[in-house]
Amino acid sequence: MRSVYFVAARRTPIGKLRGALSHVRPDDLAAAVVRDLVATAGIEPGQVDEVYWGAANQAGEDNRNVARMAVLLAGLPESVPGATVNRLCASGMEAVTVAARTIASGEAEIVVAGGSESMSRAPFVLPRPDDGLPNAMSIADTRLGWRLVNARMRELHGLLSMGETAEEVAQRYKVGRERQDEFALRSHQNAAAARDAGHFAGEIVEIDGVTSDEGIRADTSLEKLAKLKTVFKADGTVTAGNSSPLNDGAAGLVLMSEDALKRSNLEPLGRYVAGASAGVHPDVMGIGPVPATQKVLDRVGWKIGDLQQAELNEAFAAQALAVVDQLGIDPAIVNPSGGAIAIGHPLGCSGARILTTLLHRMRRTGDTRGLATMCVGVGQGSAVLVER
């Protein structure tokens, strides 16, 4: 198998629900990043062999195959193909993994991969009725969670909401409210410090004058977080403050074979080492990064102690802390630039976003081994290892 390198990694600012990016279609968010990536990498648009793009929704303006839409809207030649990848929250990460495997197998030299999501613009949907004249019809909000579910799924696994799965993880792995709030505070503090130090500047593509993430709250405190009511369970621990919000954004990376890299004379951001995914019970989907990370580490012979930097997507503080505990990873290396609780979690974008942040930080710090990992709705986890 051939070596695969990252030569560019960029993202939009992450917008709040109904915030500064809510007027921008998801295909336009994707196109803006694809266009910028080609320019940043200094490659000719026609050199791109494939675009793989993640999207978790696919019910609205992402228009079935947002990857192909992004190719054409970005002005790439019509000869450049595009395929959309959906592993829910890990869609952007899965797109990168598919791209890396395509290059490693010798089927491509240069691939653009990433993901986008506009949760602000996610549509409501109506199922097509079996009866031509139904007495009533249900409408589904496609922003997050279950929709138009097979009744057999309820019988087999139940249908806990994302927040309810976080409560389940908190209970099973004994992650208390105070610890969750402390983790959320750290996320905001670290993200604010990284933003103010200019650490995100090299990542961000300006969109209509927006240049920074909207959700970072530098002024939050444990006192403020402690006052928030639990959302999913009366005697629970999960609140809006220790959970990731709903967001809009896009992120992507350019991957190259070693031969293409040598011809380009570009300095790589890092090397793709390996990726893996794993399944868990849907009720504890938040613990998914544990088996996924263990699988990918075993695949390459690394140990958890070999890692110097880690990006763990913070769907909920409860699950992130449970993952840290179960992996035995040093908490100090996890999300030192903040995470999704502060920055945001636009579903299909997030896997590519955390890889982008990880690679830029490793270049800045000089660290050589990194992990990006995340939980996935309906009981999965995904992980990618990189090195410099």
Task: Name what the model sees in each region.
Residues 1-24, 36, 144, 149, ...:
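Condensing-enzyme catalytic core mediating Claisen C-C bond formation in acyl metabolism
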Residues 11-12, 22-27, 31, 40, ...:
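N-terminal extracellular/periplasmic Venus flytrap/periplasmic-binding protein-like
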Residues 22-90, 94-111, 116-134, 204-212, ...:
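Conserved beta-ketoacyl condensing-enzyme motif
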Residues 24, 55-111, 142-146, 156-161, ...:
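Conserved catalytic cysteine-centered active-site region
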Residues 27-42, 66-70, 95-98, 162-169, ...:
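Short, well-ordered amphipathic alpha-helical segments that serve as non-catalytic structural scaffolds
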Residues 87-117, 170-199, 253-259, 346-367, ...:
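Active-site-proximal alpha-helical scaffold in enzymes
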Residues 110-168:
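Flexible glycine-/small-residue-enriched beta->alpha junction loops
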